[in-house]
Amino acid sequence: MLKKDMNIADYDPELFNAIQNETLRQEEHIELIASENYTSPRVMQAQGSQLTNKYAEGYPGKRYYGGCEYVDVVETLAIERAKQLFGATYANVQPHSGSQANSAVYMALLKPGDTVLGMNLAHGGHLTHGSPVNFSGRLYNIIPYGIDESGKIDYDEMERLAVEHKPKMMIGGFSAYSGIVDWARMREIADKIGAYLFVDMAHVAGLIAAGVYPNPVPHAHVVTSTTHKTLAGPRGGIILSAADDEELYKKLNSAVFPGGQGGPLMHVIAGKAVAFKEALEPEFKTYQQQVVNNAKAMVEVFLERGYKIVSGGTSNHLMLVDLIGRDLTGKEADAALGSANITVNKNSVPNDPRSPFVTSGVRIGTPAITRRGFKEAEAKQLTGWICDILDDAHNPAVIERVKGQVLALCARFPVYG
């Protein structure tokens, strides 16, 4: 018999301890992984609701199960808010993740073996943009494009490759690129060769929703995103379009269900609906502008301390610190900073001589620290501590000093105040 007072703490102390330890880790560590963020208690409330019990294969008004009248309301709210947020005429909120959303786009628009032009993973792309270890690289003929010596996307080279190889689809978007993407130029290139333009805006969706980064929705045939990262919602994916093409919309819906998924996660879709409502509030724009301001402040200190930033700066929420030429790998930097309660991720950089398991760079992002309330002063102070460790990564005394400073700063800015 189920009772409302059932709890994990009494029933499963091993699991409860792991959850408690992770909660403490989040409170006592500074989170700088560019793809991570803190979602709101309202989103977590939705995810912990009885919506998790409901199976709802299909779409609102066209379900394969009965009893869906209220989950239809939930999903419709999420769809309409997503469309409003990004200026779309179509939204699918069912993908379980960004990768699932991307997979659905491939399924809807392509056949195995078709040619795709996507950003090289080593230059800032994503696994699902054509990496040979991913479904995208295994099932499709991938032509990679990249960045030039200045660290910017080389659109002339992109156009040359597009004309030469005539891909059926071009992919815009990234996982480690700190510049502004010219979506209009990409659409011009796509139109020149009759290709689809598909944009994966997962990393910058929150910035786009707030108007502090260019919106690809008016330019692309299809746009996908995660709903976490800068958007600060639950872990999940969405597909958007403003193409006003009902046949395209039907293909996308069919590629999600039944093509790639069965029942949607209604409790997560409720969390998405809440997050989209939060993203429509004026304070969300203030938050996203601060995310960019903090990233620029961090870059300023890195450059002052003699560190190289790929592309020389940032126009979004992230930066890539290039450690080539230094006696320090990305893996070592990641570990040293982690010992001081600063969480980053090792990351390959352009022309990286080291393997993806070691790398010569670290990727740093500001969404989570900004969510805690950090502003430019804290961002600069933190970057100074990071440089202290990178300058002397094998010195336990430096790591312990910085760890103490980090703990004090975290105590001033709790994740959930």
UniProtKB/Swiss-Prot annotation:
Its main location: cytoplasm. Gene3D superfamilies: Aspartate Aminotransferase, domain 1 (3.90.1150.10), Type I PLP-dependent aspartate aminotransferase-like (Major domain) (3.40.640.10). Keywords: Amino-acid biosynthesis, Cytoplasm, One-carbon metabolism, Pyridoxal phosphate, Transferase. Its EC number is 2.1.2.1. The modification N6-(pyridoxal phosphate)lysine is found at K229. Pfam families: SHMT. GO terms for molecular function: glycine hydroxymethyltransferase activity; pyridoxal phosphate binding. Pathway: One-carbon metabolism; tetrahydrofolate interconversion; Amino-acid biosynthesis; glycine biosynthesis; glycine from L-serine: step 1/1. (6S)-5,6,7,8-tetrahydrofolate binds at L121, G125, H126, L127, S355, P356, F357. Its cofactor is pyridoxal 5'-phosphate. Belongs to the SHMT family. This is Serine hydroxymethyltransferase. It comes from Shewanella oneidensis (strain ATCC 700550 / JCM 31522 / CIP 106686 / LMG 19005 / NCIMB 14063 / MR-1). The gene is glyA.
